[in-house]
Each structure stands twice: as C-alpha cells, then as structure tokens.
C-alpha cells in the first residue's frame, strides 16, 4: 500500500528509466553467467601445439612436487621435452627418470637444474640462461612459490620467511621469465603460464606477505600480457583456490578442492579461456569449482569489502589456532 502510494507520485518516465536500468543490469549478469558456463563446460582451450611441434621444450619451475611435478608429467605426455627446475636435485633426477621411462616410446628428453630460488644467486640464473638459450622453448610454467608455514600476523612474520616469500614468488618468477621470454618473442610463439592464487585476488589477513606477493604477480602478469600482445606469445596468470598440495596442507579433495592432476589437466585444456576471471585481462580461473566461487563473490559480496576480508581473517585465525595447538602437542610428545 505504502509502496503503491510512493510509486504513484513518481513520474512515469522515471519509472521507465529505472526499469530499463534494472533490465540492463540483470541482462548483463545473465550474459556473464552464460559466458562462464560456456568457458568452463563447452568451449575448449587453445591447442598446445600452437606453441611448438612435438619435441618443443617446456620449462617448469618448482617442478619436483605438487602442481609443478604434474605440469611436467602432463606436458611430457603431450609431447613436450621438459626442463625441470627446483631446489632438490635428487627429486629432479627421480622425476626426470620417471618421465623418460613412462614416455620412452615418445623419445621425450629432460634436462634438470637444481637451484634455490630463495638464494637469488646470479650464477644460478646464468646456468639457466646457458641451458635454455639453445632450446626451442614453447611453454614456460612459472610455478615456483612459497607461502607462510602457518597463518601469522604480519608484525610477527619471521624476517627470513618474509624475505623468502618475496624473493621466490616475485624475484624468481621475474628473472626466469626475463631469461626465457626473449626467445619466445624471437620465434613469435610461446605461452607463459604463471601460477596465481585467490590469496592475491582476495586480501588475506594473516597471510599478508604471501597475499601481497601474489597480487604483485597478478599485476605484473597482466601488464606483461599487454606488452606481448601481438607478438605470438600468450601470457596467462592462472588463479586457483585450494588444491591438495604440500603448500596448502590439505589432503582430501572435494567439489571445490581438486588434486594436482585434475587441476593441471583442466588448466592445460582451457588455455586462453577466462573461466571465472572475466574481469581481469590475461587471466584464467579454469577449475570449475574455483571459477563459480569467483563469479559468485564478484557479483554478490564483492572482493575487497570489509565483510569478505573479515571472513577471510576469521578463517585463517582458526587455521592458525589449530596449527599452534598441533605444534604444542607435538612438542609434548618429543
């Protein structure tokens, strides 16, 4: 009754205008959601052969475990020779042998380089440059990364941990890309995949340094994508929520938490498709559970608002409390 009275005093032209605006907004959301579903479930990604014939090389950093290991295995399965880069030489040798044995019939070659990205040594990067300069590198997977051992307030973050996160996640990724990308540009083909994180997309209290490092990679990768547009080199930052890896410390999969094999398979199948990352250029959220979560947050609560930030804080406070209790129990057993 009251609403009818109010509306009766509003000029018809105003009501028509408001209805038009509302219809436009709703139509935009519907179109966005249809695009999301098509990107996730219908449309295929770019054929990886675009970046080189069989025998072209792929460089994978952080290759000894988790997502990096899975990228190396699946790219080898697709016919790419693999340069494996990580800290532990024994793990790299084991993985190289596994790949060569598993794909012996395909004559897949591997090369390894053991380097500690936290050390940021010029001689390590010189070795990398010498290793890849003579190779036809078609794909670079910037996977190396480090997070906090447990969620921690920024002012309590150990200086060494803070330094390592920035050095590994940011400096390491930039230096590797600066070595590998020029050859791609010269050959006029290539793909640079950089592993991002919801931690860089959503402000994440108690993971402030890690969150900041991943936000930096988002801006850097998108900027690089703009620079290399038209050169034949595609740049894509891959956003993910949780995956069952050593870094996440999660062991059980769920609808929203895939294992590395599933996540990498989806990522490689959806290269060039934005998935849930519709509002960020040169970015993809390929796994459907993560993409739906991203779309919902962006179109309802928003990303950087106080409610979302505080909920994120509460979640990580809980994780920290459980981790500290576990450490206390373990200390008593020792």
UniProtKB/Swiss-Prot annotation:
Q: Which UniProt keywords apply?
A: Endoplasmic reticulum, Fatty acid biosynthesis, Fatty acid metabolism, Lipid biosynthesis, Lipid metabolism, Membrane, NADP, Oxidoreductase, Transmembrane, Transmembrane helix
Keyword Lipid metabolism belongs to the record: yes
Q: Does the keyword Acyltransferase apply?
A: no
Q: Any idea which positions bind NADP(+)? A: 59, 116, 124, 143, 210, 214, 243, 245
Pathway as given in its UniProt record:
Lipid metabolism; fatty acid biosynthesis
Give me the segments passing through the membrane. 14-34
Which subcellular locations apply to this protein? Endoplasmic reticulum membrane
Please give the InterPro entries that the UniProt record associates with this protein: 3_ketoreductase_fungal, NAD(P)-bd_dom_sf, Sc_DH/Rdtase_CS, SDR_fam
Q: Give any Gene Ontology cellular component.
A: endoplasmic reticulum
What is the superkingdom listed in this entry's lineage? Answer: Eukaryota
The residues annotated as the active site are: 210 (proton donor), 214 (lowers pka of active site tyr)
What function does the entry list? Component of the microsomal membrane bound fatty acid elongation system, which produces the 26-carbon very long-chain fatty acids (VLCFA) from palmitate. Catalyzes the reduction of the 3-ketoacyl-CoA intermediate that is formed in each cycle of fatty acid elongation. VLCFAs serve as precursors for ceramide and sphingolipids.
**Protein name per UniProt:** Very-long-chain 3-oxoacyl-CoA reductase
Per the UniProt record, the source organism is Sclerotinia sclerotiorum (strain ATCC 18683 / 1980 / Ss-1)
């Amino acid at each position: 009754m009251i609403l009818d009275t109010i509306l009766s005093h509003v000029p018809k032209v105003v009501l028509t205008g408001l209805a038009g605006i509302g219809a436009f907004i709703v139509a935009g959301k519907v179109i966005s959601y249809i695009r999301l579903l098509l990107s996730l479930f219908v449309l295929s990604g770019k054929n990886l052969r675009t970046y080189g014939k069989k025998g072209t090389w792929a460089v994978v950093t952080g290759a000894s475990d988790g997502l990096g290991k899975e990228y190396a295995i699946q790219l080898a399965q697709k016919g790419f020779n693999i340069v494996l880069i990580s800290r532990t030489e024994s793990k790299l040798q084991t993985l190289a042998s596994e790949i060569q044995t598993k794909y012996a019939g395909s004559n897949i070659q591997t090369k390894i380089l053991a380097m500690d990205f936290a050390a940021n040594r010029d001689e390590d990067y010189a070795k990398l440059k010498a290793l890849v300069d003579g190779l036809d590198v078609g794909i670079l997977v910037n996977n190396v990364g480090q997070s906090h051992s447990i969620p921690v307030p920024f002012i309590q973050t150990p200086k060494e941990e803070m330094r390592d996160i920035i050095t590994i996640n940011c400096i390491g990724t930039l230096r590797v890309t600066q070595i590998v990308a020029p050859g791609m540009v010269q050959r006029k083909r290539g793909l640079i995949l950089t592993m991002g994180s919801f931690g860089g997309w959503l402000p994440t209290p108690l993971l402030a340094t890690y969150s900041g490092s991943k936000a930096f990679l988002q801006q850097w990768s998108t900027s690089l994508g703009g620079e290399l547009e038209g050169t034949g080199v595609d740049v894509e930052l891959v956003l993910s929520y949780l995956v069952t890896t050593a870094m996440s410390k999660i062991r059980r999969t769920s609808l929203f938490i895939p294992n590395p094999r599933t996540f990498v398979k989806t990522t490689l199948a959806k290269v060039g498709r934005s998935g849930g990352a519709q509002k960020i250029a040169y970015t993809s959220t390929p796994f459907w559970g993560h993409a739906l979560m991203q779309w919902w947050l962006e179109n309802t609560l928003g990303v950087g608002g106080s409610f979302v930030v505080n909920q994120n804080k509460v979640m990580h406070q809980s994780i920290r409390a459980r981790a500290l209790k576990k450490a206390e129990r373990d200390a008593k057993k020792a």
